[in-house]
Amino acid sequence: MTAQRETVVLVHGLYVHGLWMYLLECWLEQSGYRTVNFSYPSMTRTPGQNAADLQALLEHQDTPVVHFLAHSMGGLVVRHLFHDHPKQRPGRVVTLGTPHQGSYAARIMH
């Protein structure tokens, strides 16, 4: 039986596409992780709506450990995920430049 690799879910930020995380995805895979690059419509749906889509994606992943690496608004999507769907597999969450205290862009969008 082959040991399953830990999974890192990459969640991009506002105004960009999942391809923006491609170099990180390649580096993580070369480092032995399995990756899932979650691309979502950051301008037309709320972080909560995108978190629901992320949860649906996670339900189809066969992996024992899930880590999250999120940039900017992607970190808010992950926060909504854990708030709305608290039962998650073990793993770590890393957010980069996430406006946890709010931002001007968030105020004018919603």
Language model: regions and residue ranges:
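Proline/glycine-enriched tight loop/beta-turn segments at coil->beta junctions
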Residues: 2-7
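Serine-dependent carboxylesterase/thioesterase catalytic core
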Residues: 8-19, 23, 27-110
